[in-house]
Design a protein with these regions (language model features):
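Membrane-anchoring hydrophobic segments
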Residues: 1-28, 32-35
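Membrane-water interface of alpha-helical transmembrane segments
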Residues: 15, 47-57, 82-89
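Cytoplasmic membrane-interface segments at the C-terminal ends of transmembrane helices
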Residues: 5-13, 64-86
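Membrane-embedded alpha-helical segments of integral membrane proteins
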Residues: 21-75
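Internal/C-terminal transmembrane anchor helices
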Residues: 81-112
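Non-catalytic, solvent-exposed segments at the cell envelope interface
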Residues: 107-457
Length: 457
């Protein structure tokens, strides 16, 4: 305890000052961990605060080490045998190490975290997305964030967004609707401007090897800057895809988050894996491996294939698995997990994530995410067969269903349809007009959002 050695040796003023400083620091830490705990996450996404905290921790560590050394000096007898001096010096070194290393680790972690934060999230002035901190959502009842899973494998040119989900979040309650579009959606209209001028009757792709699927839009924009004039490289794809999906769903798209699917495996590994229930055998990889049914802890590679595999399945079934995987990761990314793998998670996030969410919006999003985790209703609606057919989609119906989903009572949800996730049929599902093998008519497609809790075992 700071100051005790000074009191013992009669240095009462210095001892009082050190003790008061020690008590003040301890009280501040205790208050932060208890009374102001909810404010910590708000502060933890502000780079300026993190920079000051890192510097403060360095200063604290230096002062603490100096206090330990000085306390030993004033308590040490003037005459001591050499062996006693050596033993005392060793004890002081151990004490300095004991107090200095945790503080140094905390300062380093804060620096690493700030570096990752500023690398992933640019300021509003940098990306042209100014945020009013008094009204971060501009009075909007919902904030709509496009979640993209990008596949940039070595055998592909550029990025293919094989996973596309619009998360529409109520800014008051945190109730969330996940609207998922299949990667192979065709004949969709392009947004007004150069893109529609290029494709007046819907997107047809870039040459004979590209049939004009929704997952091609991102890379098409990157390779053809004239369809998104004035937008820099690596931002053209997100901008055109946001505008395209906004037109398909009839909903505003505020921001996007892109996750590289292969870097995603690094994040899962840094978390120590993700626990999930596998409901059926899932073949994966090139060596004939299979994820067996049951409750399992998947490593990064297994989690990646759980969300990507289409063998003996379909795009639509894996879309349902992807939602369950997203839910499991969000629930299991607890503070203890984050702290124990901090450096690995930060490095993986820098390699894996891209977004146009400005830094200034992060405090409001953290507050909103707490509402989502604290009992908000999360529902999912997938525009897949037999509800919507990718090769001949009814865009008027898509827009109506999307509007109904975000405006409906979040507690009036339907049960998951048999054979798939939120409208996703199993691999052997019949067409809507054909009878099942037993002669009965197949169930009608579910046109209402399904509770993610009910859909994911």
């Amino acid at each position: 305890v700071w100051g005790v050695a000074h009191f013992v040796t009669g240095r009462r003023i210095a001892g009082s000052l050190l003790l008061a400083l020690y008590v003040a620091i301890a009280a501040a830490v205790a208050a932060a961990a208890t009374v102001y705990r909810s404010d910590l996450l708000h502060l933890a996404v502000q780079p300026d605060v993190l920079q000051r905290l890192s510097a403060g921790l360095v200063a604290l560590g230096a002062v603490w080490v100096l206090v330990v050394i000085r306390s030993y000096q004033i308590l040490r007898p003037l005459r001591m045998p050499i062996s006693a001096r050596a033993l005392g010096a060793a004890a002081v070194a151990v004490m300095c190490f004991a107090v200095g290393v945790p503080v140094a680790w905390s300062a380093h972690s804060t620096y690493v975290y700030r570096d990752a934060l500023t690398s992933i999230f640019r300021t509003g002035s940098e990306n042209g997305r100014q945020v009013d901190t008094e009204d971060p959502f501009n009075g909007q009842a919902r904030v709509n964030i496009l979640l993209l899973g990008g596949d940039s494998a070595a055998d592909r040119t550029g990025v293919r967004t094989d996973s596309m989900t619009l998360a529409s979040v109520d800014t008051e309650t945190g109730d969330t609707v996940l609207l998922s579009l299949p990667r192979n959606l065709e004949h969709f209209p392009m947004p007004p401007g150069p893109a529609r001028d290029r494709f007046p009757y819907g997107f047809t792709g870039d040459g004979p090897l590209n049939p004009g699927l929704l997952n091609e839009v991102y890379e098409y924009a990157e390779q053809h800057p004239d369809v998104v004039p004035g937008v820099p490289k690596n931002h053209r794809g997100p901008e055109l895809l946001k505008a395209t999906i906004a037109g398909i769903l009839g909903l505003r798209v505020d921001y996007y988050i892109l996750v590289d699917m292969f870097g995603f495996a690094d994040i899962v590994d840094a978390m120590g894996g993700v626990k999930i229930k596998v409901t059926e055998p899932i073949p994966y990889g090139l060596q004939g491996a299979v994820l067996q049914p049951g409750y399992r802890t998947l490593d990064g590679k297994e989690a990646l294939w759980y969300g990507r595999s289409r063998t003996n399945s379909s795009d639509y079934v894996r879309m349902g698995r992807q939602k369950c995987l997203m839910r499991a990761i969000a629930e299991q990314a607890d503070p203890q997990t984050v702290l124990t793998s901090f450096d690995k998670l930060a490095a993986a996030a820098k390699r894996t994530l891209a977004t146009d969410i400005p830094q200034e919006l992060l405090p409001a999003l953290v507050k909103l995410s707490n509402k989502v985790k604290d009992g908000a209703e999360i529902r999912s609606l997938q525009f897949v067969p037999p509800l919507i057919y990718s090769g001949n989609p009814d865009f008027t119906l898509i827009r109506k269903l999307a509007s109904d989903a975000v405006n409906s009572d979040p507690h009036a949800v339907s049960a998951p349809p048999s054979g798939g996730q939120s409208g996703s049929p199993s691999a052997s599902a019949s067409t809507p007009d054909s009878p099942s093998p037993d002669g009965s008519q197949p169930p009608k497609p579910d046109s209402k959002p399904v509770s993610l809790e009910a859909a994911c075992p």
